[in-house]
Design a protein with these regions (language model features):
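Pyridoxal 5′-phosphate
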Residues: 1-216
Length: 216
């Protein structure tokens, strides 16, 4: 839904907003993340941990770099405070894809808030947010050949947070500051072009990827 999309300066601001507001406004006192997240997430959760406003736990990884879903459930089951789970959809270095539906269902089962850094996959991977139990996702235009300096934060319509950036009523009072109009238009056009070729591009990228994996 358009009302769930808010424009930001990029993925870093979007993830900072989601994580900080989940702690500040949604009562999350425990953050579960992984040791291989983007710095936009790891540095944000470390900052909140240092401020002593949220405890941070790191889910185990399997030998192939995938998140250990069983360990994630153990952490969720053992938590005695409201939890924020922050796990990236696609790793920007090793390319692993998180089973975002499985993680979302676990979060739903244990009443946790779920944020996924989807900067690497918006524009490259199909999303059905109506049927994906996630509270926050992020995107950045330059990841699909759009302009730098513009991104989005998706906030599920059932989530109520206060602004992270103050000083104006832009973005429906959610994010202060004059909008980057040219960046937003460029974001929309680049996303339109990326989604129009998504299946073709996925097939093209997948062919050399799996060839390399087989040969190695």
């Amino acid at each position: 839904h358009p009302a769930e999309i808010f424009f930001t300066s990029g993925g870093t601001e979007s993830s900072n907003t989601a994580i900080t507001c989940a702690v500040r406004d949604l009562g999350c006192k425990h953050i579960i993340t992984s040791p291989i997240e983007h710095h936009a997430v790891t540095h944000s959760v470390e900052h909140l941990d240092n401020l002593d406003v949220a405890k941070v736990s790191y889910v185990k990884l399997l030998p192939n770099g995938q998140v250990d879903i069983d360990d994630l459930e153990k952490l969720l089951a053992a938590a005695n405070e409201k939890v924020l789970v922050s796990l990236m959809h696609a790793n920007n270095e090793i390319g692993n894809l998180l089973d975002i539906h499985a993680v979302g269902e676990l979060c739903k089962l244990y009443g946790a808030i779920f944020h996924s850094d989807t900067v690497q996959t918006v524009g490259h991977f199909p999303f059905d947010l109506r049927n994906t139990p996630v509270h926050f996702i992020t995107g950045a235009a330059h990841k699909f050949h759009g302009p730098k300096g513009v991104g989005i934060l998706y906030i599920n319509e059932n989530v109520r947070i206060k602004p992270f950036v103050h000083g104006g009523g832009q973005e429906r009072n959610m994010r202060a500051g004059t909008e980057n109009l040219y960046g937003i238009v460029g974001f929309a056009k680049a996303l339109e072009m990326a989604t129009a070729r998504m299946e073709e591009d996925m097939a093209y990228i997948g062919t050399p990827k799996y060839y390399m994996m087989d040969e190695l």
